[in-house]
A protein has these predicted regions:
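Canonical positions in the second alpha-helix
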Residues: 403, 436-437, 470-471, 475, ...
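Structural marker of alpha-solenoid helical repeat scaffolds
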Residues: 406, 440, 474-478, 512, ...
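Alpha-helical adaptor scaffolds
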Residues: 453, 473-500, 504-506, 518
Length: 569
């Protein structure tokens, strides 16, 4: 490219073309997500979430039993999508694509503003935003519909930051509240605003920061209240975050190792995964494996503090975004609900992209042609990887298949893959995956349950009973699967003639999940066996109220109306 043309194209006179470039690139890279279906957590957070499918004010303002989250703006956006597109995923993916484009533009505008006095600051801003637009680590946030919380929080946070720089305090605080109500990670805004003002050498009046701190503190108080006097999960699931089971020292040291894994994926996003649960990442209580990560982290922090002291505004901004962005989810202060997730790197990665842009500008000063070629090649390679990765999110089968390849040590990845085989009737392949999952984590309730159901289908009743008993034993009462597992185990006890054990389990299931039609229907059958016809009739009718198509309850009521008919077992 001729340097004069490039200079004109990227000059202040042509800023609209930079915006067009960023929009076009973003759309080209993520257009194939519009073909994707609902996948993985989309079913829990959207399709099976009454706050989305039957929204009420109460539903938005309190966490559900299934997931102790307070993100009303995010769930409101899903509800609006539901009102427009119902179970058709296109509109959901379209909104995600547009949100990513908006966040990219906001990042560009923020960098332009903070770096406006820096030589070639506009080039840095463009390069950073371009790399952010195409980086494959963002595919989980964009291609997974529930990743929208990351983009909403990042977008409103960047908007609040821009408004802060432009002294629009009321709108700044409004955007901050919207960011916080999108995802709790937006609580990092105060240190970001301070770092940005320090880098520019223009602090705002003190009361401006007090307002930010006050709004953030108020949000934290509300979060604590609506989550029942606690933050996040009642207790962190070992499978989701094994870091939580380690002593504090080893948890922090291993969290630093995980932090370097994020860096590795930012540098080389080759093996990307939707899952990093138990055994996807090796953890150590050994200084030989943890000390190097700690030393490297201290060195990086010291380098950033030096940049802070010397007021190198680009480096200060990059470090602030990266460190503050990961502060809530790093598992260093307190354990969170997950050990690692690529979606969690969505906002922090902007700091990494800015760092690359700063290094690129240095190269540009030495060899402009080489620098432009390098940027084009790098953006092209990252964009191509994103396009390929987007296809992994097409269906659950493609996603889980890719997960098993990327993290073969993950018990959950194998269990999820087994679930896909089970749904398609491939029992042998399913059982192989479940057995692999149990070889990695023998106490995995999901793998135990599904293995038991397969053995039951094959007539291996005793083996099935043992597996289902273990699955139920390792299931917490607050789990959404508790009632269903109680029913499955009860059905197995009924099959082998142990009705007393089955009755006790069904009573528990009805207590925990009174809308479980199978629990009522199975209990009705036991009452029928015992000659308690009236109780059998009441339970069967209750089952049909919960699920009018329940075949067991239908057959039982037919048997009660026609005494010569045999009741279901």
């Amino acid at each position: 490219m001729d340097q004069g043309i490039a200079q004109e194209f990227l000059s202040g006179k042509s800023e609209r073309w930079r915006v067009v470039l960023l929009l076009v690139v973003t759309i080209l890279v993520y257009a194939n997500t519009l073909l994707n279906s609902f996948t993985y957590d989309d079913f829990l957070y959207i399709l099976n979430n009454p706050a989305v499918t039957a929204p009420t004010l109460k539903g938005f303002l309190e966490p559900t039993r299934a997931f102790n989250l307070f993100r009303p703006v995010t769930f409101l956006s899903f509800a609006l999508n539901w009102a427009v597109g119902f179970i058709h995923p296109f509109s959901y993916h379209l909104v995600n694509l547009l949100l990513h484009a908006a966040v990219t533009l906001l990042l560009y505008l923020l960098c332009c503003k903070v770096l406006e006095r820096m030589p070639e600051g506009d080039f840095v801003a463009l390069a950073a935003a371009l790399l952010f637009a195409v980086h494959p680590i963002h595919t989980e946030a964009v291609a997974s519909i529930v990743g929208r919380s990351e983009m909403l929080a990042a977008g409103f946070l960047l908007a609040a930051w821009l408004l802060h720089l432009r002294d629009r305090q009321i709108l700044e605080l409004v955007c901050l509240v919207l960011a916080l109500l999108s995802k709790e990670s937006a609580v990092c805004f105060l240190p970001l605003a301070l770092a940005g003002d320090y880098a520019r050498g223009e602090f705002k009046p003190r009361q401006r920061y007090f307002w930010i701190a006050g709004v953030s503190a108020l949000y934290v108080g509300v979060l604590w209240k609506v989550q029942g006097g606690r933050f996040g999960e009642v207790s962190v699931n070992f499978l989701d975050n094994p870091l939580a089971s380690l002593p504090a020292t080893w948890r922090i040291l291993n969290a630093l190792r995980v932090a370097w894994k994020y860096v590795g994926l930012l540098i080389y996003p080759g093996a990307l995964s939707y899952d990093y649960s138990y055994n996807a990442i090796r953890l150590y209580e050994d200084w030989r494996h943890t000390f190097p990560a700690a030393v490297a982290a201290i060195a990086v922090l010291a380098l950033w503090l030096w940049a802070l002291w010397s007021r190198r505004r680009g480096w200060v901004l990059a470090g602030a975004i990266y460190f503050a962005g990961f502060a809530v989810t790093a598992n260093a202060l307190v354990p969170t609900g997950t050990i690692m997730g690529e979606r969690l790197a969505y906002f922090p990665s902007a700091g990494f992209c800015l760092l690359l842009a700063l290094m690129w500008v240095r190269l540009k000063k030495l060899k402009a042609a080489w620098a432009w070629a390098a940027l084009i090649v790098l953006a092209g390679a990252l964009g191509a990887r994103s396009v390929v990765r987007n296809r992994d999110w097409r269906t659950n089968f493609t996603l889980f298949s890719a997960g098993v390849r990327a993290v073969p040590g993950s018990s959950r990845a194998h269990c999820n893959m087994g679930g896909q085989y089970l749904d398609s009737g491939q029992l042998d392949a399913a059982l192989t995956e479940f057995q692999t999952a149990l070889a990695i984590y023998p106490d995995y309730p999901d793998a135990l349950e599904y293995s038991g159901l397969i053995e039951s289908r094959r007539g291996h009743d005793q083996q099935a009973l043992e597996l289902l008993e273990r699955a139920f034993f390792f299931t917490r009462k607050e789990s959404t699967r508790y009632g269903e597992r109680a029913v499955n185990l009860a059905a197995m006890f009924m099959k082998v003639g142990q009705s007393d054990e089955a009755m006790g389990l069904l009573n528990q299931a009805i207590e925990v999940a009174p809308g479980n039609a199978r629990a009522w229907a199975n209990r009705a059958v036991i009452y029928y066996w015992r000659g308690n016809v009236e109780s059998a009739r009441v339970d069967a009718e209750t089952a049909l109220l919960a699920d009018p198509s329940n075949p067991q309850a239908q057959k039982l009521l037919e048997a009660l109306r026609t005494p010569t008919r045999v009741a279901p077992r």
